[in-house]
Amino acid sequence: MEPWPLMAWGLMLTAITGWIKAVQSRDFTEKDIIFLHPSTTPYPGGFKCFTCEDAPDNYECNRWAPDLYCPRESRYCYTHHKMSWDGNTVSVTKRCVPLEDCLQTGCSDIDHEGNRVCTACCEGNICNLPLPRNETDAIFSTTSPINRSAQSTQTLPLLLLSVSITSLMLHSIN
């Protein structure tokens, strides 16, 4: 047999193996996130969250999540994970939310149906990739102080009070 047909077979097999898709994992990776990460936003501080309502599992939620920016009034990504008594996922809900919706994170006890619910919130672009499964995961994680505007408004009265007390003390000493 001449070498050319053998080489042609080798090239053809190489091309065919490139067409065959490998089995893909049912979880998203950080590499997938890089493709979803925006280069521009519709408004300053704009971000995206995975969003779904009562998806059967995390993969289906993340896979079919619409690629939309969160509304301006939202600041966090929320995840609600309902599990059966043995830890299998019953449903997943993810969405963009304001601060008020993130004040009750954590896990509930098993209810009368044998289900447990864990909720988590996070701040950042597409930060709600994983599911909360226990108290360690079901947290509220932020990248900035939650009450930034309230801190500055509380600091001024405290400063004025401190200055007033100090001046009264100094005045009474003299």
Curated annotation (Swiss-Prot):
Function: Acts as an important regulator of embryogenesis through its enhancement of Wnt/beta-catenin signaling. Positively regulates Wnt/beta-catenin signaling by ensuring phosphorylation of lrp6 specifically in plasma membrane rafts and its subsequent internalization into signaling-competent vesicles. Essential for the wnt8-mediated patterning of the mesoderm and neuroectoderm during gastrulation.
Membrane topology: Lipid-anchor; GPI-anchor
Signal sequence extent: 1-22
One Pfam family named in its UniProt record: UPAR_LY6_2
Location of this chain's protein in the cell: Cell membrane; Membrane raft
Record InterPro entries: LYPD6-like, Snake_toxin-like_sf
One cellular component (GO) term of this entry: plasma membrane
Residues with a covalently attached lipid (GPI-anchor amidated serine): 149
SUPFAM superfamilies listed in its UniProt record: Snake toxin-like
Sites carrying sugar chains: 134, 147
Propeptide segment residues: 150-174
Keyword set, alphabetical order: Cell membrane, Disulfide bond, Glycoprotein, GPI-anchor, Lipoprotein, Membrane, Signal
Provenance organism: Danio rerio
Record note on quaternary structure: Interacts with fzd8 and lrp6.
MF GO annotations: acetylcholine receptor inhibitor activity
A biological process from GO: Spemann organizer formation
Gene3D superfamilies linked: CD59 (2.10.60.10)
Disulfide-bond pairs as recorded: 49-77, 52-61, 70-96, 102-121, 107-118, 122-127
Chain's gene name: lypd6
Protein name: Ly6/PLAUR domain-containing protein 6
